[in-house]
């Protein structure tokens, strides 16, 4: 009886102390897995509730050993329905596997094999059983009466049940009718590795567990209850490091649904999405096609960032509506397109068409628009070349060729009287002309440095001068004497106009002197310097800064030298050593333009950058900013990009100590430390029996004193007060016990009636 009374007193004392020190750190009694369940139906996904043909057995190797990090879901090893593993696992529709763990509530509700599913958020609580956190349920039907199992769900017309089944009941057993057997469960979470974790699962059907993105539990297929476990300490993980923990479970066939989870892994959520799902993508309660549909085809509708604090709010008010870029991709230099929300017409319609009327200030003629080069406007002035216009534009007018221009073009020290004659071009006459006295022979000295001595007059002798006096000269002749005979020997009249591009001739019959311009074909003109047809690129000017305009000699056509215009694109950036620029030419923006090469990121966590020396894209891990705080983790997730969440520290002894994060200061770096739970759990005490120190540590003296006073009376209180400075580290330092010579401990607060 004494032992019973003493035990009851101690238990009661422990209870009071626990209440009085409420709020001090305690080891977790339970952990909550915030999962999402995807309700399935065989009408939409024939991988569920397959026919009772052949064996239903455990099947390994259905999924790949690496998780899809962008979606955080398993991936089938084979997409072949005839693959031996798929057949054994009853995966008759491999394409439907992608809907096991991904939202497809927008799937066609009227069509078979649409993959439609209904996501439902569910929590699973694992309680501490003294050795591990555990959840066990041999009748696991978490969504009975919900989803497709809801009697109000509209049954598709195409659904034909087999004997004994109905839309909401797949079991033919009376006792099991109404249970929702077809569903899949997904949990994406994290944990900080302590160095001693284990995980064990028992149940049916498919179960896959990934740790650090690697498959560690593989009990796939439709089968009866089986078990599998993993010793996390054998996975090569680093203590104190954060890893992904991903759990996938499917119930695909009647008539059992068993689940038992035992683990020492303390999972947590880096974030909870606005649907309440641990590290979810928001799809449980937000569908871009329905929740965010603004009814406009010219916008792409997106759900908000799943990390947004929108729980309990109208999510549709926070959707993103991004204008589509489909139409702008059709733009050219001549046409710009825009998107039309008018469902009756084309989606992309022309917003603007470029016209090319020509700029009068630049003497441009009306032109046309080229999709590659933009406006092509020929110069009006090129039409008048050869008609005493220079081909240049000055103040909006085509400039005429002046005498000074002609002097520059065909000038020489022995020519003068420059003039431009339409149809012929520049002309000139001899500077030193013959006078009326034929006996005075006038010549020009091109080497003379004194202009007054440029023209030289030589007086002929009477014989030389008058030898042709009595001869009759023809129109196209001029007098001249033979040096050999001294007799009259007329020579052709000099009709040279000084222009090599004219054919000078004297017509005796018509008594005329003509100067016919040399004819050239295409874009060739006669060169004043050579008198030959040569390519003239000025005739090819299209007034477009983005083309190189040149005339190319093509040969002889119809007896004439022929040139053709070539307007090739400007080679922008040809000498630019920076290969991370893309060059283009836009006449509306002043010509050559450069834009940086964009290296698209690979997924959400690899950042692309261009290397200027090679122009090649290189990729590096995305750095997520944690603000420099040690106790904040910045980590990239392939699905969602950067996540920022509190660091969860490991401890040296997870059942007796808590990992506490300490941010860095100027004098101390941030670090994790282990702090003993207060009160310390019973099994963490090193003594043989529970002590007062174990009950409440060194911070609850007042609470202990009150408890001892209540249950030990004044004698007990006085005894405690006298000994309160004694360190209590074991059972025999507990003031509730007193060491006797017999070696037995007695309670000094117990009044033995026999002693009174």
From Swiss-Prot:
Residues 126-281 form the PA14 domain. Residues 1-23 form the signal peptide. It is a single-pass type I membrane protein. Residues 730-744 have a biased composition (Polar residues). The keyword Membrane applies. It is found in: Membrane. Residues 24-692 are extracellular. It comes from the Eukaryota. Keywords: Glycoprotein, Membrane, Signal, Transmembrane, Transmembrane helix. Its main location: membrane. Residues 714-756 are cytoplasmic. The chain crosses the membrane at residues 693-713. SMART domains: PA14. Residues 730-756 are annotated as: Disordered. Glycans are attached at residues 82, 359, 483, 564, 663. One of its GO terms (cellular component) is extracellular region. Belongs to the prespore-cell-inducing factor family. This is Protein psiP. It comes from Dictyostelium discoideum (Social amoeba).
């Amino acid at each position: 009886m004494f032992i019973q009374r003493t035990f009851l007193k101690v238990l009661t004392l422990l209870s009071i102390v626990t209440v009085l020190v409420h709020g001090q750190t305690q080891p977790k009694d339970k952990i909550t897995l915030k999962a999402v369940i995807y309700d399935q139906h065989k009408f939409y996904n024939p991988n569920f509730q397959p026919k009772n043909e052949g064996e239903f057995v455990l099947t390994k190797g259905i999924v790949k050993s690496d998780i899809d990090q962008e979606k955080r879901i398993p991936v089938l090893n084979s997409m072949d329905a005839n693959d031996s593993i798929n057949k054994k696992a009853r995966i008759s529709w491999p394409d439907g596997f992608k809907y096991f763990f991904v939202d497809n509530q927008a799937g066609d509700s009227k069509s078979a094999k649409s993959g439609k599913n209904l996501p439902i958020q569910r929590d699973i609580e694992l309680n501490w059983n003294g050795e591990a956190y555990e959840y066990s349920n041999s009748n696991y039907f978490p969504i009975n009466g919900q989803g497709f199992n809801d009697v109000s769900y509209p049954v598709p017309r195409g659904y034909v049940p087999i004997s004994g089944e109905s839309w909401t009941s797949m079991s033919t057993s009376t006792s099991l009718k109404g249970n929702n057997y077809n569903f899949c469960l997904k949990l994406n979470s994290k944990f900080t590795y302590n160095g001693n974790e284990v995980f064990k699962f028992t149940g049916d059907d498919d179960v896959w567990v990934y740790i650090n993105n690697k498959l560690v539990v593989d009990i796939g297929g439709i089968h009866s209850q089986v078990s599998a476990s993993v010793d996390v300490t054998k996975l090569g993980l680093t203590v104190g490091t954060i890893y992904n923990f991903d759990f996938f479970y499917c119930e695909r066939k009647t008539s059992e649904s068993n689940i038992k989870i035992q683990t020492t892994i303390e999972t947590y959520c880096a974030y909870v999405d606005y649907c309440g799902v641990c590290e979810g993508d928001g799809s449980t309660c937000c569908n871009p096609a329905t929740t965010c549909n603004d009814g406009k085809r010219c916008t792409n509708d997106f759900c908000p960032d799943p990390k947004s604090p929108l729980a309990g709010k109208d999510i549709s008010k926070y959707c993103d509506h991004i204008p589509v870029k489909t139409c702008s991709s059709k733009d050219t230099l001549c046409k710009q397109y825009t998107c039309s929300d008018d469902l009756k017409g084309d989606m992309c319609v022309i917003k603007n068409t470029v016209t090319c009327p020509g700029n009068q200030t630049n003497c441009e003629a009306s032109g046309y628009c080229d999709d590659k080069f933009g406006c092509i406007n020929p110069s009006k002035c090129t039409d008048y070349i050869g008609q005493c216009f220079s081909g240049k534009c000055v103040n909006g007018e085509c400039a005429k060729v002046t005498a000074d221009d002609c002097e520059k073009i065909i000038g020489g020290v022995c020519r003068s009287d420059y003039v431009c004659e339409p149809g012929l071009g520049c002309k000139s006459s001899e500077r030193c002309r013959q006078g009326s006295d034929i006996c005075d022979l006038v010549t020009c000295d091109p080497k003379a440095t004194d202009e007054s001595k440029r023209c030289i007059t030589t007086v002929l002798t009477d014989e030389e001068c008058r030898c042709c006096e009595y001869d009759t000269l023809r129109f196209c002749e001029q007098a001249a004497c033979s040096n050999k005979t001294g007799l009259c020997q007329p020579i052709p009249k000099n009709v040279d106009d000084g222009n090599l591009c004219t054919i000078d001739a004297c017509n005796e019959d018509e008594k005329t002197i003509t100067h016919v311009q040399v004819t050239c074909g295409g874009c060739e003109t006669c060169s004043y310097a050579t008198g030959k047809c040569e390519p003239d690129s000025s005739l090819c000017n299209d007034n477009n800064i983005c083309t190189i305009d040149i005339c190319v000699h093509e040969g002889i056509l119809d007896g004439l030298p022929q040139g053709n215009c070539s307007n090739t694109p400007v080679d922008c950036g040809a000498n630019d050593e920076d290969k991370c620029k893309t060059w283009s030419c836009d006449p509306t923006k002043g010509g050559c333009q450069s834009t940086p090469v964009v290296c698209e990121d690979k997924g959400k966590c690899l950042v692309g950058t261009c290397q200027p020396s090679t122009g090649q894209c290189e990729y590096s891990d995305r750095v997520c900013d944690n603000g420099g705080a040690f106790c904040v983790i910045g980590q990239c997730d392939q699905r969602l990009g950067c996540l920022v969440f509190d660091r969860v520290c490991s401890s040296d002894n997870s059942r007796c100590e808590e990992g506490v994060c300490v941010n860095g200061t100027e004098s101390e770096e941030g670090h994790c430390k282990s702090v003993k739970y207060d009160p310390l759990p019973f099994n963490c005490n090193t003594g043989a029996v529970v002590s007062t120190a174990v009950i409440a540590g060194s911070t609850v003296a007042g609470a202990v004193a009150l408890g001892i006073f209540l249950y030990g009376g004044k004698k007990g209180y006085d005894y405690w007060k006298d000994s309160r400075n004694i360190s209590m580290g074991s059972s025999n330092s507990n003031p509730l016990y007193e060491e006797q010579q017999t070696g037995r401990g007695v309670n000094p607060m117990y009044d033995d009636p026999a002693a009174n």
